[in-house]
């Protein structure tokens, strides 16, 4: 699964945090302030169309539980009170038939499950949620004899339906199985999980598509099942659907039947053994394009008919990366076909359902005439990510969700290898620094982080670990591991792992064992220190080659021994270092309490570069004079260091300064050379690294103008050099969008003028904005010259365009207006899915929070509408849980109190428990940081000529 859709692309905006403006009125009335009361200026009513009433299918109402076939019960007399399913019940095969009643927004179904029992029992239980059983379940012995059912009931605390037999059910042996048959009914509305319906417009006509999304615990919402990843079984799936629709599932079609004048039945081939979360089916009226893999497998992309041309790139990149992975993993893809389908309203970024991968449109469809280079890269990356899962996740699945990283960390790592193969000039093996390694190091330096392998025991905890630690830290430590044992042995170890656990489940220790066989290195001993405890070390260098380690934390006052870790927050570190262009690796074992001395033969003025290209998941701190030398070398000849090393120096220095381990003077001195910097990686990371300072002082009328002036001067040479013509290589286009956006952010008059000029010409219909500049033009054009007429025109264009990537950019433009009345209307539009799709609600809130006029409004709106959001999305929705992180830029005691009061009022955090911890910790750190650092930072910027 690709989850990172609620965050805007790095190419779209500076990922800086913004400080909320709280005026005297807000101070006075605190949390109960209404949006219109808490605004900073009065505004006349506008003419923007008011949101229409939500359509009926957005209701979260369930079918009536008539007849009480399996009534609710609090009976806890059996093992069903446990969160985990018992080991003695093992499903073997499902026969699943679903009838899709599109116009009624519901479906009916019947599932027959073949079950093995390893011990005698009278009770069977399996998962169900928000789906009703319409007939007393039927159970048959291996002989075919029907077993009398004493009763069935739903135990909703653990989302089970329990079936109790009148007689003992003897343990099975050999191929003998019990046969459990359940008839059920479900609703197609209310959310973007389970089996749901959404709509789209084709030539002015509203059409529907119904599809599933099951990871991690939503298969139980579609049909009764044993909904745990290690309960693998085979499936025969049939769909009965209106005759004007077609059907898809994991496997190819076996046969199609016409039932009558209105209905068809599509039956699919029997599947391989797979986990419930990978089961997928869809009913659609799409068209398709196809490629064929080198091994002869059909690779098909399904899209709306009017979007067919935008699927060409996805089809091409699929073939290139698919062929690469079949070779790399030395294992042929396991199914007869691989389909992809773009869902018009889709909750996650994409989902790797075996044989039928589902996508948000922004992640599959690319129009070379209308999409930006960043959009193209996003499509390639997500396609590659989901292709990795066809091996890591589908063929071999983690045994339980505590090892989620075996799926997502691996997909996040290998996606870069796949795209690098297909698009060799994109620098993808370096871009992993920008996309994964450096961003997640900030997350993992909080006390509220969590280990890569983490205990989870509720659906909310399961969904919450689909986060940066599982994805990006997982990818980062694999990158370090591959470099240590060599790429060739790493590849061999992956092949051993896939072969040994094909169609099975595995744990982290199983992967380590496979790599040890391939490399003859102590992989488990080293890597367990990176997966079983949170955080990472800072390696301190003294005397040029003596190194010690300690846990790196942003909060300098935090107790580094907490929460307790059996490993004591020390790591076995593969220390890579370069000397005169030659690389070496020394494993620094945690048992060396006093540190180690690297075996280098340095000359008097030599420099030992520790962690070249930031290959290891740790930070490096040098002595003060070494930092001075690095700054001087950057200024005199920055090309002495690789672009990745320049990025690493800057990111480490600013993180160390934020943690009070380095003077800010040393970190800021590293930026003096930027007038000579021309490469994408360093500029992209500089913009991110300094964004914390920018956000903390954005409301400081004395200091912020000095910050703006300095960075305007630093970015001007590269901005002038690149200009506003959308030309050059893929990387050049990404660089141009980043530096021009940064120039606009820093108030550069020429850049803002160009953005406004392009925006105003677009408003008049005179000119099309270059595709790679559209986001920053929509954003800064709206910010600087946007009025109500401009805002309404932008909204109209959003509603007219069919390309999802263009819609996303226009949503950001709408969020950038300074008119707070329009922002208030925009927030209320989030309640109308006819205007703003359900998938985009949290994206829009986050976009508004990036607006200095909207950041407090977005937070206030969340508080005022929390009950509505919980009712619409459920408390276990990971995107709802994470939306509280828009408050990360807050830095006052009042704002902290408001957050604490809000969380106290709504103590049930669901999937947001960890994000709440993290945002509170961050805001407390911000408050302390300002007290400690304003003076020294002010002195540095004041001293600038």
Swiss-Prot record:
Keywords of this entry: Aminopeptidase, Calcium, Cell membrane, Disulfide bond, Glycoprotein, Hydrolase, Membrane, Metal-binding, Metalloprotease, Protease, Signal-anchor, Transmembrane, Transmembrane helix, Zinc
EC number: 3.4.11.7
Topology class, membrane: Single-pass type II membrane protein
Tissues where the protein occurs: Highest expression in kidney proximal tubules and ileum enterocytes. High expression also detected in liver and pituitary. Lower levels in heart, adrenal gland and brain. Not detected in aorta, lung or spleen. In heart, higher levels in ventricle than in atrium. Also expressed in glomerular mesangial cells.
GO biological process: angiogenesis; angiotensin maturation; cell migration; cell population proliferation; glomerulus development; peptide catabolic process; protein processing; proteolysis
Cytoplasmic topological intervals: 1-18
Cellular compartments annotated: Cell membrane
Record: residues binding substrate: 215, 349-353, 878
Positions of the UniProt region annotated as Disordered: 45-77
Residue(s) at site: Transition state stabilizer: 471
GO molecular function, one term: aminopeptidase activity
PROSITE patterns in the record: ZINC_PROTEASE
Cofactor detail note: Binds 1 zinc ion per subunit.
Cofactor(s), names only, from the UniProt record: Zn(2+)
Residue intervals passing through the bilayer: 19-39
Catalyzed chemical reaction(s): Release of N-terminal glutamate (and to a lesser extent aspartate) from a peptide
Residues that bind Zn(2+): 385, 389, 408
Subunit and partners: Homodimer; disulfide-linked.
Family: Belongs to the peptidase M1 family.
Annotated protein name in UniProt: Glutamyl aminopeptidase
Organism name: Rattus norvegicus (Rat)
């Amino acid at each position: 699964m690709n989850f990172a859709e609620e965050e805007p692309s790095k190419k779209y905006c500076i990922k800086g945090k913004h400080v909320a403006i709280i005026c005297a009125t807000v101070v006075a009335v605190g949390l109960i302030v209404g949006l219109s009361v808490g605004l900073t200026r009065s505004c006349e009513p506008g003419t923007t169309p008011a949101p229409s009433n939500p359509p009926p299918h957005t209701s979260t109402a369930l079918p009536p539980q008539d007849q009480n076939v399996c009534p609710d019960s609090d009976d806890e007399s059996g093992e069903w009170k446990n969160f985990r399913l018992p080991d003695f019940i093992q499903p073997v095969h499902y026969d699943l038939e679903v009838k899709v009643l599109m116009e009624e927004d519901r479906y009916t179904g019947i599932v027959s499950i073949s079950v093995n029992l390893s011990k005698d029992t009278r009770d069977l239980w399996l998962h169900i949620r928000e789906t009703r059983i319409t007939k007393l379940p039927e159970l048959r012995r291996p002989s075919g004899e029907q077993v009398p059912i004493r009763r069935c009931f739903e135990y909703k605390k653990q989302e089970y339906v329990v079936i109790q037999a009148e007689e003992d059910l003897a343990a099975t042996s050999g191929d003998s199985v019990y046969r459990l048959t359940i008839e059920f009914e479900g609703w197609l509305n209310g959310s973007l999980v389970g089996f749901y319906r959404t709509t789209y417009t084709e030539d002015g006509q509203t059409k529907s598509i119904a599809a599933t999304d099951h990871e991690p615990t939503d298969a139980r919402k579609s049909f009764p099942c044993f909904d745990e990843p290690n309960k693998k079984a085979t499936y025969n799936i049939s769909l009965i659907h209106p005759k004007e629709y077609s059907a898809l599932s994991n496997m190819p079609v076996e046969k199609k039947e016409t039932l009558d004048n209105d209905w068809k039945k599509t039956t699919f081939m029997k599947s391989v053994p797979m986990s419930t979360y990978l089961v997928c089916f869809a009913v659609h009226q799409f068209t398709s394009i196809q490629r064929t893999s080198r091994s002869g497998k059909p690779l098909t992309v399904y899209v709306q008919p009017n979007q067919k041309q935008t699927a060409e790139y996805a089809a091409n990149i699929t073939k290139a990366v698919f062929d690469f992975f079949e070779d790399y993993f030395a294992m042929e893809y396991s199914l007869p076909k691989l389909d992809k389908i773009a869902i018009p309203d889709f909750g996650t970024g994409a989902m790797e359902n075996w044989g039928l991968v589902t996508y948000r449109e922004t992640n599959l469809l690319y129009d070379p005439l209308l999409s930006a280079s960043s959009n193209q890269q996003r499509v390639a990356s997500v396609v590659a990510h989901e292709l990795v899962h066809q091996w890591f996740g589908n063929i071999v699945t983690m045994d339980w969700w505590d090892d989620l990283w075996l799926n997502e960390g691996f997909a996040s790592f290998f996606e870069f290898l796949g795209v690098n193969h297909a698009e060799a000039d994109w620098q993808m093996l370096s871009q992993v620094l920008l996309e994964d390694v450096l961003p997640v190091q900030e997350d993992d330096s909080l006390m509220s982080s969590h280990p890569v392998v983490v205990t989870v025991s509720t659906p909310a905890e399961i969904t919450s670990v689909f986060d940066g630690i599982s994805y990006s830290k997982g990818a980062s430590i694999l990158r370090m591991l591959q470099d240590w044992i060599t790429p060739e042995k790493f590849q061999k170890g992956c092949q051993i792992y896939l072969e040994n656990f094909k169609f099975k489940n595995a744990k982290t220790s199983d992967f380590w064992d496979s790599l040890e066989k391939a490399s003859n290195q102590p992989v488990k001993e080293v890597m367990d220190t990176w997966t079983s405890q949170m955080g990472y070390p800072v390696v301190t260098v003294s005397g040029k080659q003596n190194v010690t380690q300690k846990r790196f934390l942003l909060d300098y006052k935090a107790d580094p021994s907490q929460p307790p870790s059996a490993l004591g927050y020390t790591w076995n570190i593969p220390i890579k270092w370069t000397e005169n262009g030659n690389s070496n690796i020394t494993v620094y074992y945690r048992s060396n309490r006093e540190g180690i001395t690297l075996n280098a033969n340095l000359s008097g003025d030599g420099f030992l570069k520790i962690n070249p290209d930031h290959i290891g998941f740790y930070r490096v701190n040098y002595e003060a004079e070494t930092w001075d030398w690095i700054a001087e070398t950057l200024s005199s000849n920055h090309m002495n260091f690789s672009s990745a090393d320049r990025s690493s120096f800057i990111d480490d220095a600013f993180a160390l300064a934020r943690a009070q381990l380095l003077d800010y003077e040393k970190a800021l001195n590293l930026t003096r050379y930027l007038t000579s910097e021309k490469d994408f990686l360093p500029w992209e990371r500089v913009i991110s690294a300094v964004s914390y300072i920018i956000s903390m002082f954005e409301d400081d009328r004395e200091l912020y103008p000095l910050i703006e002036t300095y960075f305007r001067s630093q970015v001007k040479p590269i901005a002038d050099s690149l200009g506003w013509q959308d030309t050059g290589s893929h990387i050049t286009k990404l660089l141009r969008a980043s530096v021009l956006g940064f120039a606009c952010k820093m108030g550069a008059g020429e850049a803002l003028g160009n953005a406004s000029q392009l925006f105003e010409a677009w408003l008049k219909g005179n000119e099309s904005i270059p595709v790679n500049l559209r986001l920053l033009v929509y954003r800064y054009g709206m910010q600087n010259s946007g009025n109500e007429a401009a805002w309404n025109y932008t909204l109209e264009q959003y509603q007219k365009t069919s390309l999802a990537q263009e819609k996303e950019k226009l949503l950001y433009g709408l969020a950038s207006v300074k008119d707070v009345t329009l922002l208030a209307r925009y927030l209320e539009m989030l309640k109308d899915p006819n205007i703003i799709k359900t998938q985009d609600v949290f994206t829009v809130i986050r976009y508004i929070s990036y607006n200095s006029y909207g950041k407090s409004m977005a937070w206030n709106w969340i508080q005022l509408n929390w009950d509505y959001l919980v009712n619409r999305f459920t408390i276990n929705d990971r995107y709802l849980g994470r939306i509280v992180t828009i408050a990360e830029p807050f830095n006052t005691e009042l704002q902290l109190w408001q957050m604490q009061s809000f969380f106290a009022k709504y103590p049930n955090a669901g999937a947001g428990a960890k994000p709440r911890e993290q945002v509170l910790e961050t805001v407390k750190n911000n408050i302390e940081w300002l007290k400690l650092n304003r003076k020294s930072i002010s002195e540095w910027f004041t001293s600038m000529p």
